[in-house]
Swiss-Prot record:
InterPro entries: CUT_N (IPR056953), Cuticlin (IPR051962), ZP_dom (IPR001507). GO terms for molecular function: structural constituent of cuticle. Glycans are attached at residue 284. Residues 20-354 are extracellular. Disruption phenotype: RNAi-mediated knockdown results in shorter and fatter dauer phase animals (dumpy phenotype), which have no alae. RNAi-mediated knockdown results in a folded pharynx and intestine in some animals. One of its GO terms (cellular component) is plasma membrane. It is found in: Cell membrane. It comes from Caenorhabditis elegans. The keyword Glycoprotein applies. Residues 1-19 form the signal peptide. Plays a role in alae formation in L1 larvae. This is Cuticlin-3. Keywords: Cell membrane, Cuticle, Glycoprotein, Membrane, Signal, Transmembrane, Transmembrane helix. The gene is cut-3. It is a single-pass type I membrane protein.
Length: 389
């Protein structure tokens, strides 16, 4: 009995040692500094930091990773023009959002349970200044009452299958999805929306334009000309594709908001049928972003906003993807085929094995007991006969 207890104690000791996490973690909330040309994120750690701080998906790029350690502070500074920092203009509220996702990894080589990922966002507000001067007015003045109508709030979604599908984060090559742009307004029949200047990039600077400045499609194999079911909605079906060596796709589009004329329809782009392979590779547009941080000088830019959507493409060319994987924020639960699937179906837990073993043992014991009783009863008459003789 002592031998079994010692063995059990050793097993528990080994299990407890193997389950020890990294002895460090983030203390409190991260400190974010929104600078004129960069975002700085700092973290306080419980013990001296010996890991990495990097932009999600860009660990291999040295400029997007900070490996400094030895102190109880970790952080990284990210310029706007590097590391896939997202920049989107907004009309409500009016300004520019700068967004990125930063990962704090405490192990030098692997991601562990104590690591954390933070979505960091800075907002640069545009302020309209009113300049006035003193003038003479007559005794009779006219009072003006102005009601400000808020601008629409727009979003870009990639849905599964069609316009009523669920948003997707993961998809396979060739899967049918629906690109949908929607603007919500507090008023009815007041605004018109036109989607244009759409690009897709891999998060590593390889940007391709798929809708031109007029809102016309450039490559029918990537995205066809958009349809406008309502004044503030646009959409089009498409099939999922990916870059040759990158799984993530980052879409960004511009939406122009105009005031709708009474008793008239919203103006829509007049586009010809797009040709195949007409997508245009673009250069870095950082200079344009820095201009929008200042007061825009061109009136045409005043009512243009940016929207973004992301999609992770899985390179599965055959077979169907489980529905749980295509839903937003769902767990990845794919199954292997062939022998792996057969082994997975036969795999049961240790608890179930114990229950089955006990049940089989009881069954064998009962069977032996019944057999013994039957044999005993059959032996009784023969013994009596021998006694009589």
């Amino acid at each position: 009995m002592a031998r079994y207890s010692l063995g059990l104690g050793l097993c528990l000791l080994v299990a407890s040692v193997s389950a020890i996490p990294v002895d460090n973690n983030v203390e409190g909330e991260p400190e974010v500094e929104c600078g004129p040309t960069s975002i700085t994120v700092n973290f306080n750690t419980r013990n001296a930091f010996e890991g990495h701080v990097y932009v999600k998906g860009l660990f291999d790029q040295q400029e997007c990773r900070n490996d400094e350690g030895g102190r109880q502070v970790a952080g990284i500074e990210l310029p706007f023009d590097t590391c896939n920092v997202a920049r989107t203009r907004s009309l409500n509220p009016k300004g520019v959002f700068v967004t990125t996702t930063v990962v704090v990894s405490f192990h030098p080589q692997f991601v562990t349970k104590v690591d954390r990922a933070y979505r960091v966002q800075c907002f640069y507000m545009e302020a309209d200044k009113t300049v006035s001067t003193q003038i003479e007015v007559s005794d009779l003045t006219t009072a003006f009452q102005t009601q400000v109508v808020p601008m629409p709030i727009c979003k870009y979604e990639i849905l599964n299958g069609g316009p009523t599908g669920e948003p997707v984060q993961f998809a396979t090559i060739g899967q049918q999805v629906y690109h949908k742009w929607t603007c919500d307004s507090e008023t009815v029949d007041t605004f018109c929306a036109v989607v244009h200047s759409c690009t897709v990039d891999d998060g590593n600077g390889d940007t391709v334009q798929i809708l031109d400045e007029n809102g016309c499609a450039l490559d029918k194999f990537l995205l066809n000309n958009l349809e406008y079911p309502t004044d503030l909605m646009a959409g089009q079906e498409a099939h999922v594709y990916k870059y040759a060596d990158r799984s993530q796709l980052f879409y960004q589009c511009q939406i122009s908001i105009t005031v709708k004329e009474p008793n008239e329809e919203c103006a829509r782009p007049t586009c010809s049928e797009p040709q195949g392979f007409g997508a245009v590779k673009q250069a870095n547009q950082t200079a344009q972003f820095f201009r929008v941080l200042k007061k825009r000088s061109a009136p045409v830019m005043e009512n243009i906003l940016d929207v973004r959507a992301e999609l992770t493409t899985l390179e599965v060319l055959e077979g169907n993807l489980p529905s749980s994987l295509t839903q937003a924020q769902a767990l990845v639960a794919s199954r292997e085929i062939g022998e792996d699937s057969f082994r997975q179906e036969l795999c049961i837990s240790s608890f179930h094995i114990s229950v089955v073993t006990v049940f089989l043992g009881l069954t064998v014991f009962v069977a032996i007991f019944i057999t013994y009783m039957i044999v005993s009863r059959m032996m009784v008459p023969s013994d009596k006969m021998q006694s009589a003789c």
